């Protein structure tokens, strides 16, 4: 017996592992029977209860160090405090509802590795009419940025957003359609179509130039005026022709010429075709673009969205086999129509902060190309390289909205995303063909499509960098003490601010040069928009050490040009002028609260406004700006004395279609020299090159002043 016990103990000691104790399933445990420990166990399979064989989960005990427990407790406390502060930082115009504290295991969405740092926890809505749904305000919209700036100037984070009311209402469109809109005479129709092709067809590919004129002649020759498809297309073209050749259209009840033709074309295209045609897509493009002339931005977005979906239904985003479409003109037209839809989708969305409607990964189409013979190409199409550059720029614009103004989750920091976007913009401007570059020696010779391309580029730079510029202004205001100096602001923030100011000055110069030369369209949307965007940045620049006090004069010039455009019937200019006028009132109010100072007049202006207004410390050391400041129109490189006298003695000089501004040359601002500012200049500065050359690791180690990019969103952390 003892030998047997010793043998058993010896076997157990020599066993490599102790036998695991079998845990019974719930059924075997209740019946107090032996369980095999399988899943399902043998007893449950035997009685047909295999699906009910369940085991009670075991709560094992593990040993951890005390330091690890302390680390978990401190991390838990940090997340609770961060969640509470994030919940309290909400928009002032939102309903004051307490936000629920997220559970401890919820992802930390205030970190840029999870969510965009530029926007708040909730979307921005503004109710201005109780009978309609609240308006969504996209942070990428320039009017939204103007509201943020006005809140900063006044120190009032409850300052309401200014809604857009200057647009052609649905009742006015219905009234315009009710008029007896007829085909014009052949000669007038041909003239209107040629004007439309010349003015908008040089910027976007909308129609085949020669084929469109030939089709117009065929319609008048055969008398076939009843085709709805043709009537929609040509009435839309007539609308553009009138917008660029007339000053007003009183019979339509609208301030914008061409509204009657637009209303008629829109009504005829209400029924969407089940089998769409390229002609119908052309019409949707024309109607979408003209909607901007009526300042109907939402309608424009809906129309281009319809065109995109119809284009997908016929596979425009794919290459069609040559065997199924032999005609090279039709093949190239198909390609270019899609890319125009693509450009509109990206550009229209960027104006309001809406996402792109199709990702780039779903597009499998060749870029535009030339066809042979060259004469045939020139008769039907515009410059291929210009359209290609426009497509590439639109792609960057779409990425800017997605990476900086959306709630998508990214592992990269804010500065890393900005750096990648600026690298793409730098590559775009460096690879731009020579004939698409601006002629710095003679700014008056800029062709319309080239200047439009560079204005779009500058706006993309502004979109990418202006949140940082506003952040810089806020940081100078937060700590009103001599300790706030240029060393407390990281160099990347200063560099991005300078790039934003440079782009704004360049756009301002291009548009005012067009205004003086009389080539600025009265009823266009985009020049008014770009002027408004640049004026906001220049107003901010006048307060910053990297800017110049003279930029405030450029702001005043932009305000006067928008006022004159508004008086001539430009609805978009009316909206933007009203916004800038409110900004000017905030600037004047801020200036009136400044104490009288006997310091050097050349010192950077500072503000010590009383009350709740912001205060920028006057002790901020001046930083050498690499962007040439604006100067008055009296500088000889741009205007001679005779030209200045001509403008002074003739108020209508240089203004399209007989506009009558009241401002004098002394209020106008221009660059020091005609070639003083170039599109690529901001990317040539050493500080910008250093920023673009930094690694992701370096940009991930943010300067203390930039922790807002990791911890709090840009606007709500400043109570705007």
Predicted regions and their residues:
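Intrinsic, low-complexity transcriptional activation domains
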Residues: 1-203, 224-232, 238, 252, ...
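Fungal C-terminal regulatory tails
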Residues: 86, 311, 353-355, 364, ...
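Fungal transcription factor middle regulatory core
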Residues: 116-163, 195-198, 214-221, 243, ...
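Intrinsically disordered, low-complexity transcriptional activation domains
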Residues: 134, 410, 613-720
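C-terminal transcriptional activation/regulatory domains of eukaryotic transcription factors
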Residues: 158-279, 284-296, 323-329, 374-382, ...
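Residue register of alpha-helical TPR repeats
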Residues: 236, 282, 340, 388, ...
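"A position-specific structural signal for the A-helix of alpha-solenoid helical repeats
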Residues: 240, 286, 340, 344, ...
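Classical protein tyrosine phosphatase
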Residues: 294-310
